[in-house]
């Protein structure tokens, strides 16, 4: 039997949802896990979500914008006030090891025969969005595998160009 991957993403510290997804993955015979970022942010359980993703996905995780801002003491000017409050709250909840782990995640990475990125491949640290064919087209040139998984949009999307997804 071959490898079967579950691609996790935009968990946003929602332990109840993550638990349900993991239970469903187990019934589907998933053997490996990856995460396209944003493990933390918005919800109440950042610590346990980080620890579970670390346990299951290991190095097959990339940094999301919420992971980035919650792992460091960067200025939050320009953030929506409620979003800034959530970042501050999450920063206080995480221990040093969790902050360091989040802050050291890569922006993109290759796993086996596919790529992971949270935002865009052309400038992943700028947290741009891929919502349409034009934005996807700009990223295909940076894709080094036939398949790339991304998060950030909270919308299930797929784009294809000459056999590259």
Each language-model region and where it sits:
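Core catalytic region of metal-dependent phosphoesterases/phosphodiesterases
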Residues: 2-101
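Active-site-proximal beta-strand elements of phosphoester/diester hydrolases
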Residues: 4-12, 113-120, 165
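Histidine-centered divalent metal-coordination motifs
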Residues: 12, 65-66, 118-120, 152-154
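Glycine-rich phosphate-binding loop signature in dinucleotide/nucleotide-binding domains
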Residues: 25-30, 111, 142-144
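Divalent-metal (often Zn2+) His-rich catalytic cores of metallo-beta-lactamase-fold enzymes
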Residues: 58, 68, 125-128, 159-165
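Active-site-proximal segments of metal-dependent phosphoesterases and phosphodiesterases across multiple
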Residues: 78-84, 114-144
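Short acidic-hydrophobic surface loop/beta-edge motif
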Residues: 107-112, 159-161
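Conserved beta-sheet core of the metallophosphoesterase superfamily
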Residues: 130-165
């Amino acid at each position: 039997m071959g490898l079967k991957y579950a691609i996790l993403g935009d968990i946003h510290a929602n332990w109840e949802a993550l638990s349900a997804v993991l239970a469903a993955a187990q019934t589907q015979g998933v053997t490996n896990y990856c995460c396209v970022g944003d493990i933390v942010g918005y919800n109440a359980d950042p610590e346990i979500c980080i620890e579970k993703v670390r346990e299951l996905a290991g190095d097959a995780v990339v940094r999301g914008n919420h992971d980035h801002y919650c792992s460091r003491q960067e200025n939050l000017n320009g953030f929506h006030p409620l979003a800034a409050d959530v970042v501050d709250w999450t920063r206080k909840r995480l221990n040093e090891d969790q902050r360091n782990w989040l802050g050291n995640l890569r922006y993109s990475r290759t796993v086996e025969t596919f790529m992971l990125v949270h935002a865009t491949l052309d400038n992943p640290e700028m947290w741009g969005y891929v919502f349409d064919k034009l934005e996807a087209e700009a990223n295909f040139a940076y894709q080094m595998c036939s398949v790339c998984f991304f998060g950030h949009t909270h919308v299930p999307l797929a784009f294809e160009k000459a056999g590259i997804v």
